[in-house]
Regions:
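Hydrophobic alpha-helical segments
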Residues: 1-207
Length: 207
């Protein structure tokens, strides 16, 4: 249930014009998401940190990667739900749709273990993502061996890269109560609310 929390962000997003040296990164994010995320607009107070995150994000989402870019967003979504980050759940849901995941597959993500829309390789990967995103980490040798049955070592590096990126982003956005953008809230309310998602503290600056 959406409790309409309207707490103030702990740090306010700054206008994108604040950091001219980051404009190329901002435009790349706008192309991928349809908007510039408030997380990076907060982070630009330290441009080197914002630039490093932008470069890491670009590498994780590399269009020349060997793991489907839409499915990578699903991995990030499952990892973010495991961590409890409503902000990143909305962003990854929108990203999944933007990069080719069908509505019905996104809607079935929390029944992935039984849904015919998810392959054995995808189910194994999402089990792994939950274990890797848990605190403490619960990945086992057997789990990793199962992952190896479906992916090359290069692909496994990409998968762990996604989970690790969201380990950072989940903590960043939950700690700073980053306000969700209108576009992300709309995605969350359409596709995630029926599974218990709410903007919660990330609704700040919207209501």
């Amino acid at each position: 249930m959406d409790q309409r929390t309207t707490s103030s962000p702990r740090l306010m997003p700054l206008p994108s014009e604040h950091s001219p040296e980051l404009q190329d990164h901002f435009e790349a994010m706008r192309k991928n998401l349809g908007f510039i995320p408030n997380s990076i607009l907060i982070m630009q107070r330290r441009p080197k940190l914002a630039r490093a995150l932008a470069q890491m994000t670009a590498a994780v989402w590399d269009p020349e990667g060997k793991v489907d870019r839409g499915f990578k967003r699903i991995i990030g979504h499952v990892a973010s739900r495991t961590a409890g980050c409503q902000y990143c759940m909305a962003h990854t849901a929108g990203g999944a749709l933007r990069f080719g995941i069908e509505d019905k597959k996104l809607a079935a993500v929390w029944e992935y273990q039984t849904s015919p829309l998810y392959s054995t390789a995808e189910r194994t990967t999402l089990d792994f993502a939950i274990a890797a995103a848990s605190v403490p980490n619960t990945v086992t040798d057997d789990m990793f061996a199962e992952l190896r049955k479906h992916w090359t070592e290069e692909q496994i590096v990409e998968i762990v890269g996604v989970i690790s990126l969201f380990g950072f982003l989940n903590r960043w956005n939950d700690t700073l109560t980053t306000p969700l953008e209108d576009e992300a809230i709309a995605i969350g309310e359409q596709f995630l609310a029926s599974h218990g998602w709410s903007p919660g503290k990330h609704r700040a600056l919207v209501d």
